[in-house]
Protein backbone atom coordinates (compact mmCIF):
# COMPACT_ATOMS: atom_id res chain seq x y z
CA UNK A 1 0.00 0.00 0.00
CA UNK A 2 1.41 3.34 -1.06
CA UNK A 3 1.33 6.33 1.25
CA UNK A 4 0.85 9.79 -0.26
CA UNK A 5 2.09 12.82 1.66
CA UNK A 6 -0.50 15.59 1.97
CA UNK A 7 1.41 18.72 0.95
CA UNK A 8 0.06 22.29 1.05
CA UNK A 9 -1.52 22.04 -2.43
CA UNK A 10 -3.35 18.79 -1.68
CA UNK A 11 -4.50 20.17 1.66
CA UNK A 12 -5.89 23.30 -0.01
CA UNK A 13 -7.75 21.20 -2.59
CA UNK A 14 -9.20 18.97 0.10
CA UNK A 15 -10.44 21.94 2.13
CA UNK A 16 -11.85 23.93 -0.82
CA UNK A 17 -15.39 22.42 -0.69
CA UNK A 18 -15.62 23.07 3.05
CA UNK A 19 -14.42 26.66 2.61
CA UNK A 20 -16.99 27.25 -0.14
CA UNK A 21 -19.76 25.87 2.07
CA UNK A 22 -18.63 28.06 4.96
CA UNK A 23 -18.54 31.15 2.72
CA UNK A 24 -22.02 30.58 1.29
CA UNK A 25 -23.35 30.09 4.82
CA UNK A 26 -22.44 33.72 5.53
CA UNK A 27 -25.44 34.77 3.44
CA UNK A 28 -28.83 33.45 4.55
CA UNK A 29 -31.76 33.88 2.15
CA UNK A 30 -35.02 32.86 3.82
CA UNK A 31 -37.41 34.00 1.15
CA UNK A 32 -38.08 33.60 -1.71
CA UNK A 33 -37.39 29.88 -1.66
CA UNK A 34 -36.27 28.11 -4.81
CA UNK A 35 -38.55 25.91 -6.88
CA UNK A 36 -42.19 26.19 -7.86
CA UNK A 37 -44.84 28.20 -6.06
CA UNK A 38 -48.42 29.19 -6.80
CA UNK A 39 -49.32 32.25 -4.76
CA UNK A 40 -53.05 32.64 -4.26
CA UNK A 41 -55.12 35.56 -3.10
CA UNK A 42 -54.85 39.26 -3.78
CA UNK A 43 -51.50 40.72 -4.75
CA UNK A 44 -49.81 42.48 -1.85
CA UNK A 45 -49.78 46.24 -1.58
CA UNK A 46 -46.91 47.81 -3.53
CA UNK A 47 -46.68 50.95 -1.38
CA UNK A 48 -44.51 51.15 1.73
CA UNK A 49 -44.98 53.31 4.80
CA UNK A 50 -43.04 56.59 4.83
CA UNK A 51 -42.16 58.17 8.17
CA UNK A 52 -40.19 61.41 7.90
CA UNK A 53 -37.58 62.72 8.40
CA UNK A 54 -35.60 59.45 8.18
CA UNK A 55 -37.51 57.27 5.72
CA UNK A 56 -36.15 53.85 4.76
CA UNK A 57 -37.17 50.84 2.75
CA UNK A 58 -39.40 48.85 5.11
CA UNK A 59 -41.37 45.61 5.19
CA UNK A 60 -44.14 46.60 7.57
CA UNK A 61 -47.14 44.28 7.18
CA UNK A 62 -45.74 42.27 4.26
CA UNK A 63 -46.23 38.51 3.92
CA UNK A 64 -43.32 36.24 2.97
CA UNK A 65 -44.50 35.96 -0.66
CA UNK A 66 -43.93 39.70 -1.13
CA UNK A 67 -40.49 39.85 0.51
CA UNK A 68 -36.82 39.25 -0.14
CA UNK A 69 -35.66 38.45 3.37
CA UNK A 70 -32.65 36.98 5.14
CA UNK A 71 -29.46 37.79 6.99
CA UNK A 72 -25.74 38.29 6.37
CA UNK A 73 -23.92 36.78 9.33
CA UNK A 74 -20.45 38.31 8.89
CA UNK A 75 -20.31 42.05 8.24
CA UNK A 76 -17.22 44.13 7.42
CA UNK A 77 -16.25 47.08 9.58
CA UNK A 78 -17.98 50.26 8.34
CA UNK A 79 -15.86 52.50 6.13
CA UNK A 80 -13.90 55.01 8.20
CA UNK A 81 -14.87 53.37 11.46
CA UNK A 82 -12.62 53.76 14.47
CA UNK A 83 -12.95 53.03 18.15
CA UNK A 84 -16.28 54.33 19.37
CA UNK A 85 -17.18 55.72 15.94
CA UNK A 86 -20.93 55.36 15.48
CA UNK A 87 -21.16 57.65 12.44
CA UNK A 88 -19.08 55.63 9.98
CA UNK A 89 -20.67 55.07 6.59
CA UNK A 90 -22.78 51.95 6.21
CA UNK A 91 -21.80 49.41 3.61
CA UNK A 92 -24.88 48.00 1.86
CA UNK A 93 -25.13 44.51 0.48
CA UNK A 94 -25.90 43.98 -3.21
CA UNK A 95 -29.24 42.65 -4.41
CA UNK A 96 -29.78 41.37 -7.95
CA UNK A 97 -33.38 40.71 -9.00
CA UNK A 98 -33.97 39.32 -12.48
CA UNK A 99 -30.70 40.86 -13.63
CA UNK A 100 -31.20 44.31 -12.06
CA UNK A 101 -28.56 45.14 -9.41
CA UNK A 102 -29.26 47.54 -6.56
CA UNK A 103 -27.98 48.28 -3.04
CA UNK A 104 -29.56 46.40 -0.13
CA UNK A 105 -29.55 48.16 3.25
CA UNK A 106 -28.81 46.00 6.28
CA UNK A 107 -29.86 46.18 9.92
CA UNK A 108 -27.16 46.31 12.59
CA UNK A 109 -27.39 42.52 12.94
CA UNK A 110 -27.10 41.98 9.17
CA UNK A 111 -30.79 41.32 8.64
CA UNK A 112 -32.63 42.56 5.56
CA UNK A 113 -36.23 42.59 4.32
CA UNK A 114 -36.94 44.15 0.94
CA UNK A 115 -40.52 44.19 -0.40
CA UNK A 116 -40.79 43.08 -4.03
CA UNK A 117 -43.81 42.50 -6.23
CA UNK A 118 -43.16 39.39 -8.36
CA UNK A 119 -45.34 38.74 -11.38
CA UNK A 120 -46.05 35.34 -12.90
CA UNK A 121 -43.14 33.46 -14.48
CA UNK A 122 -39.50 32.68 -13.71
CA UNK A 123 -37.45 34.85 -11.34
CA UNK A 124 -33.90 34.93 -10.03
CA UNK A 125 -32.71 36.56 -6.79
CA UNK A 126 -29.11 36.97 -5.62
CA UNK A 127 -27.76 38.62 -2.44
CA UNK A 128 -24.05 39.52 -2.21
CA UNK A 129 -22.37 40.30 1.10
CA UNK A 130 -20.57 43.67 1.36
CA UNK A 131 -16.80 43.55 1.26
CA UNK A 132 -16.43 39.83 0.51
CA UNK A 133 -18.83 39.50 -2.42
CA UNK A 134 -19.98 36.12 -1.09
CA UNK A 135 -23.37 35.42 -2.66
CA UNK A 136 -26.49 33.35 -2.17
CA UNK A 137 -28.75 32.73 -5.17
CA UNK A 138 -32.19 31.29 -5.68
CA UNK A 139 -34.47 30.75 -8.66
CA UNK A 140 -38.18 30.11 -8.59
CA UNK A 141 -41.26 30.04 -10.80
CA UNK A 142 -44.37 31.93 -9.78
CA UNK A 143 -47.21 29.83 -11.20
CA UNK A 144 -50.04 31.82 -9.67
CA UNK A 145 -52.07 34.33 -11.64
CA UNK A 146 -50.10 37.45 -10.69
CA UNK A 147 -50.35 40.86 -12.30
CA UNK A 148 -47.29 41.56 -14.42
CA UNK A 149 -45.30 44.79 -14.37
CA UNK A 150 -45.10 46.23 -17.87
CA UNK A 151 -42.97 49.20 -16.79
CA UNK A 152 -40.60 49.29 -13.83
CA UNK A 153 -38.15 52.14 -13.12
CA UNK A 154 -35.61 51.56 -10.34
CA UNK A 155 -33.52 54.39 -8.84
CA UNK A 156 -30.56 53.63 -6.56
CA UNK A 157 -27.40 55.53 -5.62
CA UNK A 158 -24.01 54.91 -4.03
CA UNK A 159 -23.82 57.14 -0.94
CA UNK A 160 -25.05 56.98 2.64
CA UNK A 161 -27.02 59.79 4.29
CA UNK A 162 -28.15 61.33 0.99
CA UNK A 163 -31.62 61.84 -0.46
CA UNK A 164 -32.29 61.41 -4.17
CA UNK A 165 -35.82 61.46 -5.56
CA UNK A 166 -37.34 59.71 -8.55
CA UNK A 167 -39.77 61.67 -10.74
CA UNK A 168 -41.72 59.92 -13.51
CA UNK A 169 -43.91 61.86 -15.96
CA UNK A 170 -46.34 59.77 -18.02
CA UNK A 171 -47.66 60.63 -21.50
CA UNK A 172 -50.98 61.72 -19.99
CA UNK A 173 -49.16 64.32 -17.88
CA UNK A 174 -49.45 62.50 -14.57
CA UNK A 175 -46.36 63.14 -12.45
CA UNK A 176 -45.44 60.56 -9.81
CA UNK A 177 -42.91 61.53 -7.11
CA UNK A 178 -42.59 61.50 -3.30
CA UNK A 179 -45.34 64.12 -2.94
CA UNK A 180 -47.86 62.20 -5.08
CA UNK A 181 -46.95 58.52 -5.13
CA UNK A 182 -50.07 57.05 -6.79
CA UNK A 183 -51.38 58.03 -10.22
CA UNK A 184 -54.86 57.47 -11.62
CA UNK A 185 -53.34 55.61 -14.60
CA UNK A 186 -52.13 52.77 -12.34
CA UNK A 187 -48.52 53.85 -11.84
CA UNK A 188 -47.08 54.14 -8.32
CA UNK A 189 -43.88 54.89 -6.42
CA UNK A 190 -43.21 52.40 -3.62
CA UNK A 191 -41.32 54.57 -1.11
CA UNK A 192 -39.36 57.80 -0.56
CA UNK A 193 -35.91 56.90 0.80
CA UNK A 194 -34.21 59.84 2.54
CA UNK A 195 -31.27 58.07 4.24
CA UNK A 196 -29.11 56.92 1.34
CA UNK A 197 -28.73 54.17 -1.29
CA UNK A 198 -32.42 53.71 -2.17
CA UNK A 199 -33.93 52.02 -4.01
CA UNK A 200 -37.05 53.86 -5.05
CA UNK A 201 -39.19 51.90 -7.52
CA UNK A 202 -41.89 53.11 -9.89
CA UNK A 203 -44.07 50.38 -11.37
CA UNK A 204 -47.09 50.23 -13.64
CA UNK A 205 -49.08 47.22 -14.89
CA UNK A 206 -50.80 49.30 -17.60
CA UNK A 207 -48.52 52.15 -18.71
CA UNK A 208 -50.17 54.44 -21.28
CA UNK A 209 -48.61 54.69 -24.73
CA UNK A 210 -46.54 57.72 -25.66
CA UNK A 211 -43.55 59.71 -24.43
CA UNK A 212 -42.26 59.08 -20.90
CA UNK A 213 -39.76 61.26 -19.03
CA UNK A 214 -37.72 60.23 -15.98
CA UNK A 215 -35.93 62.75 -13.75
CA UNK A 216 -33.70 62.44 -10.69
CA UNK A 217 -33.53 65.23 -8.12
CA UNK A 218 -30.69 65.52 -5.59
CA UNK A 219 -32.87 66.62 -2.69
CA UNK A 220 -30.28 66.81 0.08
CA UNK A 221 -27.29 65.46 1.99
CA UNK A 222 -27.91 66.70 5.52
CA UNK A 223 -25.32 69.24 6.62
CA UNK A 224 -22.90 68.18 3.89
CA UNK A 225 -22.98 70.14 0.64
CA UNK A 226 -20.13 68.53 -1.27
CA UNK A 227 -21.21 64.88 -1.47
CA UNK A 228 -21.07 63.67 -5.06
CA UNK A 229 -23.24 60.60 -5.54
CA UNK A 230 -23.76 58.43 -8.61
CA UNK A 231 -27.37 57.65 -9.44
CA UNK A 232 -28.24 54.42 -11.24
CA UNK A 233 -31.51 54.24 -13.15
CA UNK A 234 -32.82 50.94 -14.52
CA UNK A 235 -35.76 50.97 -16.94
CA UNK A 236 -37.44 47.59 -17.49
CA UNK A 237 -40.29 47.07 -19.94
CA UNK A 238 -42.48 43.98 -20.49
CA UNK A 239 -40.95 42.31 -17.44
CA UNK A 240 -41.05 38.51 -17.40
CA UNK A 241 -42.00 38.14 -21.07
CA UNK A 242 -39.97 37.26 -24.20
CA UNK A 243 -40.14 40.98 -25.09
CA UNK A 244 -38.49 42.11 -21.83
CA UNK A 245 -35.95 44.89 -22.21
CA UNK A 246 -33.61 46.34 -19.58
CA UNK A 247 -31.65 49.58 -19.85
CA UNK A 248 -29.34 50.92 -17.14
CA UNK A 249 -28.04 54.49 -16.90
CA UNK A 250 -25.55 56.01 -14.43
CA UNK A 251 -25.44 59.75 -13.79
CA UNK A 252 -23.22 61.71 -11.35
CA UNK A 253 -25.24 64.00 -9.08
CA UNK A 254 -22.92 66.74 -7.83
CA UNK A 255 -24.83 68.84 -5.30
CA UNK A 256 -28.21 69.15 -3.56
CA UNK A 257 -30.79 70.95 -5.67
CA UNK A 258 -29.63 69.44 -8.95
CA UNK A 259 -32.42 68.10 -11.21
CA UNK A 260 -31.43 65.87 -14.14
CA UNK A 261 -33.55 64.37 -16.89
CA UNK A 262 -31.99 60.92 -17.11
CA UNK A 263 -34.14 59.25 -19.73
CA UNK A 264 -36.98 59.88 -22.16
CA UNK A 265 -38.53 57.00 -24.09
CA UNK A 266 -41.58 55.95 -26.07
CA UNK A 267 -43.97 53.12 -25.21
CA UNK A 268 -46.24 51.73 -27.93
Describe each PLM feature range.
Residues 54-74, 148-152:
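Contiguous beta-strand segments within globular domains
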Residues 102-109:
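Short beta-strand segments within Ig-like beta-sandwich modules, predominantly Fibronectin type-III
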Residues 115-122, 208:
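Surface-exposed, short loops/turns at beta-strand junctions within beta-sandwich domains
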Residues 120-132, 214:
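Short, aromatic- and glycine-rich surface loops/edge beta-strands on solvent-exposed regions
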Amino acid sequence: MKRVAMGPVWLALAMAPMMATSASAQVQLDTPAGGWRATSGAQKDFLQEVNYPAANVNANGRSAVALIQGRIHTLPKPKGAGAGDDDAARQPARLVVDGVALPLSLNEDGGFARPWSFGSGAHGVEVRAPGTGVARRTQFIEAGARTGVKLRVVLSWDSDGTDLDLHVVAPDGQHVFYGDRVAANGGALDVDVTTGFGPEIYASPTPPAGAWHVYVNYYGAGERRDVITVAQLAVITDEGTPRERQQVFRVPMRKPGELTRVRSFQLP
